[in-house]
UniProtKB/Swiss-Prot annotation:
It comes from Danio rerio. Dimer; disulfide-linked. PANTHER family: GAMMA-INTERFERON INDUCIBLE LYSOSOMAL THIOL REDUCTASE GILT (PTHR13234), GAMMA-INTERFERON-INDUCIBLE LYSOSOMAL THIOL REDUCTASE (PTHR13234:SF43). GO terms for biological process: cell redox homeostasis; hematopoietic stem cell proliferation; immune system process. This is Gamma-interferon-inducible lysosomal thiol reductase. Disulfide bonds join 72-75. Lysosomal thiol reductase that can reduce protein disulfide bonds. May facilitate the complete unfolding of proteins destined for lysosomal degradation. Plays an important role in antigen processing.
Length: 255
């Protein structure tokens, strides 16, 4: 909890009148460690100043990673009714990572990766489109994918959704990635990332929070991701956290 980045900041915050010579001479720690813990801050006579300093620092954002499939009903429900709405309301305290792959299988033939998806070839195409969008559009891809997954037909919605949220990006540029070596490589990276999960995923949507997956975190995320993010954020809670957003989405595609 206690910690800081720059000694210069401490010099500015802690005036000589507050940090008396008596404390400075009795402190065996360098200034770079004064706010590293309450005990050290107290020993060096700067506890009050460290409390004030740390209270002004922005806490780390809560990172939510979603391992999913483009045509899995449970994945679509969680992404559209929980993940993206929560991100919109809590974007100052959370970040997300989308990994389209899920329960797919990967083999290699003639120097290329071949993917077999749980919900057929259409899902493999959807996964690849969303992967290429994430690579090309960055965070802007989230709303395009939200639009796709909200539609009756994910694949038919892809091009119109891109036109709505990123009209400056051509559909041809996305499909060039999808059909080329770049898309194949990116999907392989998703496969490696998914297969490296610890514990291994057993179903999708599979959710990790700050890199961790437990049954309890999964249940809380599926029950109310909004409440979970608010509860885990260690900084000052945004006003939105007092409102609440609850929608249970316990629907899975088993591995």
């Amino acid at each position: 909890m206690f910690g800081f980045n720059l000694c210069v900041v401490l010099v500015a915050v802690f005036s000589l009148s507050k940090c008396s010579a008596r404390f400075v001479y009795s402190c065996k720690y360098p200034p770079s460690q004064w706010c590293s813990s309450e005990d050290i801050a107290a020993e060096c006579g700067v506890l009050e100043q460290c409390m004030k300093y740390n209270s002004t620092k922005a806490a780390d954002k809560v990172k939510v990673s979603l391992y999913y499939e483009s045509l899995c009903p449970g994945c679509r429900m969680f992404l559209t009714s929980q993940l993206v709405p929560t991100l919109i309301m809590l974007q100052d305290i959370m970040e997300i990572d989308l990994v389209p792959y899920g329960n797919a299988q990967e083999t290699q033939a003639q120097g290329k990766y071949i993917f077999t998806c749980q919900h057929g070839e259409d899902e493999c195409l959807g996964n690849m489109i969303e992967t290429c969008m994430l690579n090309k559009l960055g965070l802007d891809a989230v709303m395009v994918i939200f639009c796709m997954e909200s539609g009756n037909d994910v694949l038919k919605s892809a091009q119109p959704c891109l036109g709505v949220y990123r009209p400056d990006v051509t559909w041809d540029s996305i499909m060039q990635c999808v059909k080329g070596d770049q898309g194949n490589k990116l999907m392989h990276e998703n496969a490696v990332k998914t297969d490296a999960l610890n514990p291994p995923h057993q179903y999708v949507p599979w959710i990790t929070v700050n890199g961790e997956h437990t049954d309890d975190l999964q249940d809380k995320a599926m029950g109310s991701l909004f409440s979970l993010v608010c509860s885990l954020y260690k900084g000052q809670k945004p006003a939105a956290c007092t409102l609440g957003l609850k929608k249970n989405t316990n629907n899975y595609c088993m591995n």
